[in-house]
């Protein structure tokens, strides 16, 4: 509409807007390590983002890290059916149809017909997109652990996974996440989340408790976020981290991240009044526009 009216248009990338909204709420214009974790948003490279580490300020951003890319198969259905993401990650890890078929059957992820369709779409690259969505990882783990294989509303599977983790914490207390070193890929660091999902699937098949595994997933992902911020600090010299995106509505993950980052000397910005999900993006966009307008006046 603005273009049709001949008005200037300022385009702000989705995950960058999340970080700007957190910066605006906390009244800072200093550069930050932005941790933008959510369900879905278009990246600048044509893939789906959602588990991003950004070096960000009001002048722009650089993508310096992410969760491990996976193939999101099935279009919009994959956002509702976490088993699709689970199968995709397991298939990517094994690169073997028969092995993946046995695991998917044992985990009761889907029926044989749907599984064959997943293989076909993946192998022929039909209705697929590369994704780094942290939200979809929650859906995949929820499916693997038998908590929720599908969602009837946004965030159902991931919320159920959080509740399971909280129950596991109450019953058994907190554990310590094992070390999974970061690696380099296409000029950025990558959290080894594929290995994490694979390990959880193996342990579930050995009969380990789903609630305890849900807790360990939260701990491991928080540890990965902390390691990512430490790596970003080494690269950028920044010690301020801004946590935003719908995944940080998960209070358990947020708690683990806040505790770990503050113990390591980070100044952590988080949301208090503005929602971390897409409900807060408009603030980030407006703050960016105000910054640009003020610069033009100077």
Label each residue range with its predicted role.
Residues 6-18, 239-244, 251, 257-281:
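Conserved phosphate-binding/catalytic loops in two-lobed NTP-binding clefts
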Residues 11-34:
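Conserved phosphate-binding catalytic cores of ATP/NTP-utilizing and phosphoryl-transfer enzymes
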Residues 39, 134, 241-248:
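Glycine-rich beta-strand-to-loop/alpha-helix junction loops that act as flexible
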Residues 88-239, 252-258:
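A contiguous, well-structured pocket-lining segment that forms one wall/lid of small-molecule binding clefts
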Residues 42-43, 47-67, 107-112, 117, ...:
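Flexible glycine/proline-rich, aromatic-decorated loop/lid segments
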Residues 98-106, 286-298:
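Acidic, glycine/GT-rich loop-and beta-edge segments that sit at the periphery of enzyme/chaperone cores
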Residues 62-76, 101-104, 122-126, 266-272:
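Short beta-alpha connecting loops at secondary-structure transitions
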Residues 32-36, 131, 242:
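Short glycine-aspartate micro-motif
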């Amino acid at each position: 509409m603005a273009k049709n009216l001949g008005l200037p248009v300022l385009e702000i990338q989705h995950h960058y807007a999340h970080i700007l909204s957190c910066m605006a709420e906390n009244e800072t214009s200093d550069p930050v390590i932005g941790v933008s974790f959510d369900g879905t948003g278009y990246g600048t490279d044509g893939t789906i983002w959602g588990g991003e580490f950004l070096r960000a300020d009001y002048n722009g951003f650089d993508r310096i890290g992410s969760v491990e890319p996976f193939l999101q198969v099935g279009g919009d259905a994959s956002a509702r059916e976490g088993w699709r993401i689970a199968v995709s990650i397991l298939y990517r890890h094994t690169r073997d149809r028969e092995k993946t078929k046995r695991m998917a059957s044992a985990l009761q992820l889907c029926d044989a017909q749907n599984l064959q369709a997943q293989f076909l779409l993946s192998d022929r690259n039909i209705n697929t997109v590369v994704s780094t969505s942290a939200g979809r990882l929650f859906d995949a783990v929820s499916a693997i652990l038998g908590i929720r294989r599908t969602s009837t509303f946004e965030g159902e599977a991931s919320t159920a996974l959080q509740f399971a983790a909280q129950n596991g914490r109450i019953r058994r207390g907190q554990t310590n996440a094992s070390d999974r070193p970061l690696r380099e890929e296409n000029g950025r660091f990558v959290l080894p989340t594929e290995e994490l999902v694979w390990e959880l699937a193996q342990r579930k098949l050995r009969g380990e408790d789903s609630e305890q595994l849900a807790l360990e997933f939260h701990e491991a992902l928080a540890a990965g976020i902390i390691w990512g911020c430490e790596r970003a600090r080494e690269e950028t010299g920044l010690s301020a981290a801004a946590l935003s995106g719908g995944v940080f509505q998960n209070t358990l993950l947020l708690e683990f991240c806040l505790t770990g980052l503050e113990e390591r000397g980070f100044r952590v910005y988080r949301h208090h009044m503005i929602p971390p999900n897409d409900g807060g993006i408009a603030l980030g966009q407006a703050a960016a526009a105000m910054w640009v307008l003020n610069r033009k006046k100077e």
